Amino acid sequence: MEDWVSCRSEEQKRCEEKGQSTFDESEEEQWRRLKEEAMIDSDDSEGAAGDEGAVVLAEAKRRKPRKSGKVIATQKCAQPQNQHRHQQKLTKSLSTYDMENLLKQYRNISAEEEDEVDVDITKFLQDDGVDSEDGEGPSVTATELLSSLISGRSADTNKTEELADSFPLANLNDEVFTYENEAAVKKTPRNKEKRTNKSGANYVIKETVVEELNVVTDLAEVRTGSQHASTDFLNGCPPKALFYWFDAKEQPHTLTAPGTILLFGKVCMNEEDEEFRSCCVRIQHVHRNVFLLPKEGSTDAEVVQEINAICRGSGIEERRIKFVERYYAFEEPGVPREKNRWAKLVYPGRYPPFPNKGGLTHVQVVVGASRSLLELFLIKKRLMGPSYLEIEHLVTAMDRVSHCKTEFLVPSPKDIKVYNSSKPPPPFTVASIQLHAQLDSDGVKNEVIAASIALYGDVSIDGERKPNITECFTGVRQLSPDAPLPLDLETYCLSKRMPGVHRFINERALLTWFAETLAALDPDIIVGHNIIGYTVETLLNRYQELNIVRWSTIGRLDVRRFPRIQGNNFNLAIEKEACVGRLVVDTYLLAREYYKSTNYKLLSLSTQMEIKGITDNRGHFEPGSTVLVKDSMMSSEALCPILLQLLNCAVLSFNVASFLDVIPLTKRLTLLAGNLWSRTLYGARSERIEYLLLHAFHNLKFVTPDKKKRDLKRGREDDDDEGKRKTKYQGGMVLEPKSGLYSEYILLLDFNSLYPSLIQEFNVCYTTIDRDENTVSAEVPPPESLICLSCRAAGLPSPCLHKCILPKVIRGLVDSRREIKRMMKSEKDPGNLAMLEIRQLALKLTANSMYGCLGFEYSRFYAQPLAELVTRQGRLALQNTVELIPQISPSIRVIYGDTDSVMIQTGIKDDIVKVRNLGFEIKGKVNQRYQSLELDIDGVFRAMLLLRKKKYAALSVVDWQGEGKVYKREVKGLDMVRRDWCPLSQHVSDAVLKRILNAEGGEDILDFVIKYMKGVAQDVRSGNVYPLEEFVISKSLTKEPESYHGTGYPHAVVALRMKQRKEGVRVGDLIPYVICEGDEHIDDKAYHIDEVRRSDGLSVDVEWYLSSQLYPPVMRLCEHIQGFVPEQLSEAMCIASHMRTERDVKEEDTANDFSHCSIFKSRALSECFPTATALQVQCTHCQLVVPVDPHKYINDMFSSREKPPPTAPFELYVCFNCGRSLPLAYLANCMTQMCHTIIRQFYCSGGNVASVRALRAQFTYLRAMFDVPQALNCPSAVKNAHRVLSLRCLGTDRKLYTLADVERFPDVEPVDPLLACAESFYRRIDHLFVSLDKLFDTP
């Protein structure tokens, strides 16, 4: 018998003799050759092979052979007959997929091995460790290896033992693999920047470096599932227990257990050992309370009779009615705002709510009919957020409704009492989860590919200590049945210090494991980035699609029936309902609430916060965005970094939550408000204030108003539509800024908590302001209104207990915060200091949100007259301060003011002490006028560039209370802080702004800007300086991409193409795109950055970027600097610009069609004027209606590569259909009629703001279309075509000239009659605006 090496060698020799290579054979021939080689030395008897069943090798580990110049000698050995049969059966059982992979390895022999005479094919079937330095060590033949793989044992025990260190054999039963240490062969990553471009690219191409992911955090080994089993370990039920509650749920009256409240928390099983277990407490026999105000003149018996009749009609069989005295002070019309006699109806919660249809005979108003049982329970039991409860009469629940480890029944709410103690809260278990889902093969549904869970035990919800990761779990499934996962995945990941990896054959198995794991871990808090709106929605959709039995383990309610959905997706309410019992920390929502950024993606946030996960770098995989393919999941080496990055994102989500301290902060906010902690985590700010006031008024025996129903038809709209919702009353005062560059010190003074302070200052409250339903503007309450009638009759002092409730609540918050800040000054321990900081921040956020309940239309405590009074007093306070400042010192002046702050130009250049003393003087004079309102120094600016309202940049003096030598730049409202400007635009603006603010004088600022921008423009056009990433623009999706209609949404067009490529696109995502060259609309020129990288024919539209991304922000930064002329900047950048009037600059803050039209290019005016109507005329020859567009006509002529540029006079206005000339007089007449029609429509519309904008945009569009020769930096070829080559024969003196006459009279400039017409109408729109500020000026 010959071995495989000799066969391969002879065959290669025969091919060399024929002058051809072995690898020139076809795939079929190579396949046949491999089969023949595998069958060498085996018997030809097919009967023996047919006696036994075929053995199918499902999957084998194939590793790339190590490059070596030495030949491995293969020993000859006689094979037994049974091994021959095994070899034959293996050959027949090889699948097409396995054989193709074998062929691929067959072809990929290194160049060094091709030159060798003897090549061993067994290298493709064994581990790298078979190589030895001298090449003479023991080896294993291919037949022995394949036979051992089938039988599960070694073919030669002695040989296997000798090769134990270098040649690990894989047993398919136990799947035990070993690997050599790769630390010694770690490659140094290359980080080069290529200066050469690919063909057609006009940007620097960066070589993408994929760094190896290494775990830098020790991850604990995963414990067995039995240790997490959720079994009830109680042998008996204690008479009472200490229970820490943090979430609750009301059972509606339509379910099997109506009128029940479920409390979720942790029960203390052993007070000595402080052992806590998750627990659900079901409170039975909860009652509803309804208050009914009898009409004047009705008797108690009549009221009771009418109430009983309504209850009998509604099926309320059990009820109690009694008459009580209660106060009322809110907006229900016809209800007196004093103490009154009310009828109180009490009945069990298992009955439906009391009907409140109005039109009752003896009852004037019904309050509390729509109030939920849970709200009533929290208010009546005075549960102020998560806390300990002492519960009596516990009964172990036999019919469990939750996934908690323990579950009890409580007969009555009276068995629950608040446990007043300073006992610290129990430790919590936190699970941070991260999914990777991508569209299926049809591009319709999101399917889960992998999921990771990072578990944190013993977490302090007060933020006393930072926890470490306890366990980690990661599950991954194969993409399709024909793409199995590598068998050694778990062992390989474990060798990379990543435990807890599990493989699954399909999505159903993966999700079943995920649901069971959550049930076993039983976390109290679930953390995730965009978990509400994406993760939970994806899980619920896939759970329902695949009918996962334990789908409800995402929460703690054991629900078997899936919720009903409308359409294809769950709404947010259903998602939150599914998570009841577990607190959900969505770092995306909370970061938007408590962290200011332009990009709220997880990886971007972690970079901004300088947060690290468990790896030393980020890798190339991004969960939810990167599309996984089969090739990336075929080997453990490729799949392990993906799973590691998935787990790393789960860890990063928890680290972001820890960085923001959202768990202790939201807990403290809940303790102040007395609402549900879960609702605070979802960002229900108005609800927090409502509960705070509900507790305050209920404790004083007030009847509180019901919730208002919101307009459910109002959906999610674009950001532009938000501005259409106008406030019903005037807000704060914003002074007109005195724009310019200031080099003297600027003093910034600010009222501390203006609106809460005004409420205290003027006793603004529901109980003190007289008003009715017709009151629009309320007045400051007089002193006699600060005491109620009953307290006045009792001789009590003013203000009484039942008045000024809102100011008292705010004063309590302010005083508490002041006390905590005093404690922080003396606190030395960092842990205690951090906890105090969280407490004071919670008090500040709550106090500042109190005003919102007055002006929010859908708040149950909405009172427009009170909100209007507060803002009016705020405007008066600011105005009085502005008037007082010049009286203190004539040399100072107010340059800007906004709601609660003023900026003062001090006139001082180099003495910070004088500036500080001036601020203290102004502060003292203003504060003498008020008791609760306080003006303070908010900051000092060393230099300031003030552009317009809410737009400025300044150098803030950090140590203004000291020497004043430390500066920090502060930017507000400028283009450079917005994400819809590319990084290059932001960097250029940053450099210009840095030079402006740091300049001693304005002499060389403009020279620097002109020179710098000229160099930038040259670098951009050269394409050899800036990489592609500098041109990426990012914009957020406010709705589904399919919901965008019309033009002007390039990010939506790019998002649609991303969805076609099965990339994950969700509402709220930032869509990156690049504008490339082309004559299409901007929507059609936008491409994803990956599309540009992959394409050789796409190039960045540098002219568009220069005119639309670089010029506008720099021009706006410099326009108020003395001596700046926009034309100088446009000439330096070699772009075309259009002169802007002073009125254009003033109206730039308002979004309209004219706001971005100061820059004109010689093409694509439709991009600048998307709403303008084009000029269309009927051809006098072919009778078709054709557009008139000289821009497009000339640019098409010069951009055409098929035709040479025109060299002889040609007609400019020709029909696009027949190509014949159109008469100039006829065109001018058509344009005049069109303009008259537009003006007539404008007057018919009433001349509103929208009509004015549309009219200006239309006439500016027409003027720009025919004004190309007048535009600066118009290309010489285009300008020559317009003015010389084309037949424009109307002179400036309104006389007709021929081209020859023009040459003889050079002073006579040819003028287009259409341009003259456009200019005449353009001047007429000036009469639409009257400057009233100079109307009464005297000369």
Curated annotation (Swiss-Prot):
Residues 8-19 have a biased composition (Basic and acidic residues). GO terms for cellular component: alpha DNA polymerase:primase complex. Residues 1-29, 60-89 are annotated as: Disordered. It is found in: Nucleus. GO terms for molecular function: chromatin binding; DNA replication origin binding; DNA-directed DNA polymerase activity; nucleotide binding; single-stranded DNA binding; zinc ion binding. Its EC number is 2.7.7.7. Its main location: nucleus. It comes from the Eukaryota. Belongs to the DNA polymerase type-B family. NCBIfam families: pol2. This is DNA polymerase alpha catalytic subunit. It comes from Trypanosoma brucei brucei.
